[in-house]
Each structure stands twice: as structure tokens, then as C-alpha cells.
A protein has these predicted regions:
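N-terminal pre-domains immediately preceding structured catalytic cores
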Residues: 2-222
Length: 222
């Protein structure tokens, strides 16, 4: 089964959210998540077919999940997030103990969620999504909003990206942002299908949103 074009489009647009600065926006006021990129589809090879939908990650135990976390991360006090790209899951650690574990959708091949150590720099409730091509604003309640009800930004890069995404060739000129967010496509959670962002079930991203603060450390394991 090939990856649906609509799904890929949504994952690209999620992966190209631009955020200006560290901030937290709550209450009932929608927050527009701005886009700062130009997306172009170069001439494609008509003979190349869409890639199959990536499979769900194999389940692992709590012990196996913690075994992948570096010792210095385990030794840190306080709350922190650890994204395990290999097993498509998000771990919540507090004072070195794993308190929660969630399935997650991560970046697809060639568009992997950036590995490294970062910090949460923006939290948005009910984000308003800006279409990167038309400029249309899509409210959080709309079925056309791929961000879900929460946005937690932790990575920003302005070098641009390009390549095959499983469905088409894309060139992204400008800044891209990766973060945790909800998704209307529940079946994608647990798969490597995005362009870098991390999708969680709505009920899970709301829990994570309430747990973290601006500055919370995020470690992404390859």
C-alpha cells in the first residue's frame, strides 16, 4: 500500500512550521503558527512510484527503552523528554525515572527528526495553521489542520532541506521547525511518516503539554 499523497502533504506542512521566538500561549486565544518557507516540487521521475507506508515500530519493554538512554541523561534531575526514533516512542523522565511512555510518529527516511539535545522553546494551545502555499489560515477545530490541539516546538533550522519524501521530490527554502503535536491521522502514530515533526495521539500530546515548561530538555536518540 502506497503512502497517500494527502498524508504526505500534511506531514510536510507540519514539518515546516516557523516560530519566531520562545513563548507560551494559552487560554482560548488561537495562536497562529507562521510559515517561513517556500516549498517547490522539482521535475519528478514519472516512473518512480510512491514508497510503501512505513510499518509500525516493534514494541519494546520499559527496560529496553531505558537501556538506550545515555547515562548522563538518566542522571539529570527534573523532568525531561527523550524521543527514541528507532522505536518510535516518547519517554517522559523525572529525576531519572521513566514515568510515561507514548507511541509517536517520527520523520520518514531522508526527513528524519533531528537527533541531538534541544529545549522546548514554544508551547501553543489550539494552534492556527498557515498553509505554506495558499497562505490560508486553518483553525485548530478544522479537519484540515494537521497540528491537532497542541504544539510544542523544540528545533529550528534555516538551512533548507530537499529530497524524496516517499511520494514526491521537495525543495524547502527557508526555516523549518520540528515539534510535538497532535494529529487527525491516528493511524500514523507509531510510524516514520512525517517530515521531521513528532505526532502524538491527542490525549497524549495534551498530557505532555501540561507536563513540560519552556526550557524543558528534549533528547532525540537516532
Amino acid at each position: 500500500m502506497a503512502m497517500p499523497a494527502a498524508l504526505l502533504a500534511a506531514s510536510l506542512l507540519v514539518g515546516t512550521v516557523g516560530v519566531a521566538s520562545a513563548q507560551e500561549v494559552g487560554g482560548n486565544r488561537p495562536r497562529e503558527v507562521n510559515v517561513e518557507v517556500l516549498v517547490e516540487a522539482p521535475e519528478e521521475d514519472p516512473k518512480r512510484k510512491s514508497d510503501p507506508i512505513p510499518p509500525l515500530a516493534m514494541p519494546v519493554s520499559d527496560a529496553a527503552s531505558l537501556a538506550r538512554v545515555p547515562a548522563d541523561v538518566i542522571e539529570r534531575d527534573g523532568l525531561q523528554l527523550v524521543l527514541d526514533r528507532k522505536h518510535h516512542q516518547l519517554l517522559v523522565l523525572r529525576d531519572g525515572r521513566m514515568t510515561r511512555r507514548y507511541p509517536a510518529a517520527v520523520g520518514t527516511t531522508g526527513w528524519e527528526t533531528p537527533a541531538g539535545r534541544f529545549r522546548v522553546f514554544e508551547k501553543v494551545k489550539e494552534p492556527v495553521w498557515t498553509h505554506p502555499v495558499s497562505g490560508d489560515l486553518v483553525d485548530a477545530e478544522s479537519e484540515g489542520n494537521p497540528l491537532g490541539s497542541r504544539w510544542i516546538g523544540f528545533y529550528r533550522d534555516c538551512n533548507g532541506r530537499s529530497g524524496w519524501d516517499g511520494e514526491q521530490y521537495l525543495d524547502i527554502n527557508g526555516c523549518t521547525v520540528a515539534g510535538f503535536h497532535g494529529t487527525p491521522y491516528r493511524w500514523t502514530v507509531g510510524r516514520a511518516v512525517s517530515h521531521g515533526c513528532v505526532r502524538l495521539y491527542e490525549e497524549n500530546v495534551q498530557e505532555v503539554f501540561d507536563l513540560v515548561r519552556l526550557g524543558t530538555q528534549v533528547t532525540v536518540l537516532p
